[in-house]
Amino acid sequence: MSDIPGDLKFLKSHEWVRIEDNNRAIVGVSDHAQNLLGDLVYVELPNIGDHLDAGATAAVIESVKAASDIYSPVTGKVIEVNTTLSDKPETINEDPYGEGWIMVIEMQAPEEISNLLSPDDYTEVLESDEH
């Protein structure tokens, strides 16, 4: 199992979020998710300015195996997207918790963070999926 950074929160659907000061939330997909999908070939990013509700579809990633919706872990406005992924979707495969981030959301309801999984809770989800 891959190392899971301790400063992240997760959804059961394998999205991660890193909370920064000033209510900014950086969002990506977990190493587990990119491993399951295999080599990514396309990323459909949200538009800057899009309003997203927590749990709503925010982006789509496609691999040689399948397409997968990416869900927003928090409610807010998209203020930045990782345009590198348009030309190099494999960046998610290479560095899912770093350069492979997907978007930055300005959170409207920071208290939603308490609904997300801690790294330990996410590890338990992965372990229960394997059995």
Curated annotation (Swiss-Prot):
The modification N6-lipoyllysine is found at K65. Gene3D superfamilies: 2.40.50.100. Its cofactor is (R)-lipoate. Pfam families: GCV_H. GO terms for biological process: glycine decarboxylation via glycine cleavage system. Binds 1 lipoyl cofactor covalently. Keywords: Lipoyl. Residues 24-106 form the Lipoyl-binding domain. Transmembrane segments: none annotated. PROSITE patterns: BIOTINYL_LIPOYL, LIPOYL. One of its GO terms (cellular component) is glycine cleavage complex. It comes from the Bacteria. The glycine cleavage system catalyzes the degradation of glycine. The H protein shuttles the methylamine group of glycine from the P protein to the T protein. PANTHER family: GLYCINE CLEAVAGE SYSTEM H PROTEIN, GLYCINE CLEAVAGE SYSTEM H PROTEIN-RELATED. Belongs to the GcvH family. NCBIfam families: gcvH (TIGR00527), PRK01202.1 (NF002270). The glycine cleavage system is composed of four proteins: P, T, L and H. This is Glycine cleavage system H protein. The lineage of its organism: Bacteria, Pseudomonadati, Pseudomonadota, Gammaproteobacteria, Lysobacterales. The gene is gcvH.
